[in-house]
Design a protein with these regions (language model features):
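Acidic, Mg2+-coordinating active-site environments of NTP-dependent enzymes
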Residues: 2-153, 178, 203-206, 211-212, ...
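ATP-dependent carboxylate/acyl-activation modules
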Residues: 140-142, 265, 269-273, 280
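Short amphipathic alpha-helix with an adjacent loop that forms part of the alpha/beta core around
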Residues: 2, 239-252
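Glycine/threonine-rich flexible loop motifs
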Residues: 19-26, 166, 191-195, 269-270
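Active-site beta-alpha connecting loops in nucleotide-dependent enzymes
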Residues: 139, 162-228, 235, 263, ...
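Residue-level marker for buried hydrophobic side chains located in beta-strands
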Residues: 45, 154, 182-183, 258
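Short SAM/SAH-binding signature in class I
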Residues: 8, 114, 250-262
Length: 280
């Protein structure tokens, strides 16, 4: 905002990421809130009602008007999820419209609300928003679906990972009526909170009652341990183990969904590519 003053500014979420640099989630919130400092005189500060750190941001926001998404000004009603994405009624200050979103998961509905709030505050109509949300191709590394065959779906969510995004991805995997496998790598840059954060994800995976959890790296061992899964320090060994399980389930005519996710440095996409090449 030193280079160009925005007419609308938004903090989409505040999560346990980059804690090594910012020290705490409050530090992350303070740093993200600096974006509001450069608003134009009539600019609008947009806040996620589920990640509301207004006490840290009030100084930066000053007298600017505030709008909220997820609850308040922009929200989703009648939400229905499927293997192809989500449908919902988008409610805004300028009316409502039905949306068919081609992205998986509840978290992407919330991302759509964030995008809507920004777009409408700089002049977009509801029709513009609908066109923008519905006519976007899925992005590799972001819950990208790879349908290998009728009974096998790979979900490539390997671009990066933090606690919130990994839990959101687990929630997507949980919703499938299939044998559900999670391949999870370490989450990096969590500093002193690393163990706690990985344990939190392990508990979330346990609550999701996934069928198999395989972890790779160092810190992620506690995730697989929480669900009586299996940990690996060699990615090729993890992939080979997963491949054997998948082949067994397919021979039993079971549907299988595999989700891979981890921090960027873990390169968990290599597991997806290997499985795809071996099973196509």
């Amino acid at each position: 905002t030193h280079l160009a003053q925005p007419e609308a500014a938004l903090v989409n979420n505040v999560a346990a990421a980059h804690l090594e640099g910012f020290g705490s989630i409050e530090g992350v919130a303070r740093a993200k809130g600096e974006i509001y400092r450069g608003l134009t005189p009539n600019g609008v500060a947009i806040i996620n009602s589920e990640h509301n750190y207004i006490e840290f941001w009030q100084k930066e926001i000053g007298s600017h008007s505030i709008q909220y998404f997820n609850a308040g000004d922009y929200k989703a009603e009648n939400v229905k999820h499927s293997s192809n994405g989500s449908t919902f009624t988008l409610v805004s200050p300028k009316g409502s419209i039905e949306i068919n979103l081609p992205y998986l998961g509840e978290h992407n509905v919330k991302n759509a609300l964030a995008a809507t709030a920004l777009a409408m505050n700089v002049g977009a109509s509801l029709a513009d928003v609908k066109a923008g949300l519905e006519h976007r191709s899925q992005v590799k590394g972001r819950l990208f679906p790879i349908q290998v065959n009728e009974n096998l779906l790979l979900l490539d969510d390997t671009y990066n990972a933090n606690v919130d995004s990994l839990q959101a991805a687990i929630d997507v995997l949980k919703g499938y009526d299939a044998f559900r496998i999670l391949l999870v790598g370490d989450m990096k840059e969590l500093g002193e909170d690393s163990l706690k954060c990985h344990q939190q994800v392990g508990e979330h995976a346990k609550q999701a009652k996934l069928d198999l959890v395989l972890s790779y790296g160092i810190e992620s061992a506690v995730i697989s341990e929480a669900v009586l899964g299996k940990h690996f320090t060699d990615k090729a060994e993890l992939t080979a183990y997963a491949l054997d399980i998948i082949k067994q389930k397919l021979q039993e005519n079971q549907k299988v969904v595999v989700l891979a996710k981890g921090s960027r440095s873990m390169k968990m996409e290599e597991t997806i590519y290997s499985l795809k090449d071996s099973l196509c």
